[in-house]
């Protein structure tokens, strides 16, 4: 198993390595020397590979691992929510071994279910927690924390500049009848508040075009898409 962290223009400002010090950062070859000052494991991605979607596919083709975990480089909160009688509390888990063991369990569950991917909830808000539904099989996943069985059956669609994780998720549900959504843990990232990475090219227009393409390809699986502040919120019909 490899924990793959695509990153760009964020040397010295990433946080994921603080939780997962043995993860592997995949960065443009021109930035390797910058990242090596802060990161234990750094792999150079050729400069001919441009954009997050081709980068993900390059990782899948070149990492020589069957089980690949994609994680963003800017983790903010990771752990679970403890629900008490009148309030809830965020419990942080920053123990690398805990996460490695959990990721291994998720891959094992996928094998038993005949699925090829799993994902952890990517927001820590209490309103997003459903204690009676710790695992969902008809839900969305994002590549902020996503595991993929790398046997060649599923690759990211490079016609999607963004929302490539939504597309592969919907394709998997269409093909396999479900997907493994882990909801009793969360892995939340900074995203828009951190310079570099996808923020360099993820514009409202780029997002809008990707969503239009998703709706065209999976019309019965998307019920609505609304813009909230800097992001689009996609409501799925699963």
Task: Give the label of every model feature segment.
Residues 68-72, 116-121, 179-183, 223-225:
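A structural signal for short, well-ordered beta-strand segments and their strand-loop junctions
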Residues 9-12, 32, 75-78, 125-127:
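Short acidic, S/G/P-rich loop/turn micro-motifs used as interaction or catalytic elements
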Residues 1, 9-11, 160-238:
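C-terminal catalytic/acceptor-binding lobe
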Residues 14-16, 35-37, 79-82, 128-134, ...:
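A short acidic (Asp/Glu
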Residues 7-12, 50, 150-152:
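Short beta->alpha connector loops
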Residues 27-71, 76-91:
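Active-site-proximal specificity loops/subdomain of glycosyltransferases
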Residues 78-167:
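Conserved catalytic core of nucleotide-sugar-dependent glycosyltransferases
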Residues 2-38:
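Short, well-formed alpha-helical segments that are part of the catalytic scaffolds
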């Amino acid at each position: 198993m490899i924990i793959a962290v695509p990153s760009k223009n964020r040397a010295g400002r990433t946080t994921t390595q603080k939780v997962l010090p043995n993860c592997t950062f995949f960065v443009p070859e021109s930035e390797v020397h910058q990242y090596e000052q802060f990161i234990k494991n750094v792999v150079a991605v050729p400069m001919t590979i441009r954009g997050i979607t081709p980068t993900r596919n390059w990782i899948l083709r070149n990492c020589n691992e069957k089980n690949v975990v994609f994680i963003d480089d800017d983790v903010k909160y990771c752990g679970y929510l403890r629900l008490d009688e009148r309030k809830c509390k965020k419990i942080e888990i920053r123990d690398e071994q805990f996460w490695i063991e959990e990721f291994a369990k998720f891959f094992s569950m996928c094998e038993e279910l005949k699925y090829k991917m799993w994902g952890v909830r990517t927001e820590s808000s209490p309103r997003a927690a459903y204690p009676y539904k710790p695992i969902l099989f008809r839900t969305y996943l994002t590549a902020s924390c996503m595991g993929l069985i790398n046997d060649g059956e599923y690759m990211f669609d490079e016609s999607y500049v963004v929302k490539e994780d939504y597309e592969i998720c919907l394709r998997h549900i269409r093909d396999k009848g479900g997907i493994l959504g882990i909801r009793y843990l969360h892995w939340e990232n900074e995203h828009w508040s951190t310079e570099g990475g996808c923020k360099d090219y993820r514009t409202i227009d780029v997002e809008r075009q990707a969503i239009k393409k998703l709706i065209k390809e999976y019309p019965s699986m998307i019920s609505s898409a609304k813009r909230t502040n800097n992001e689009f919120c996609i409501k799925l019909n699963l």
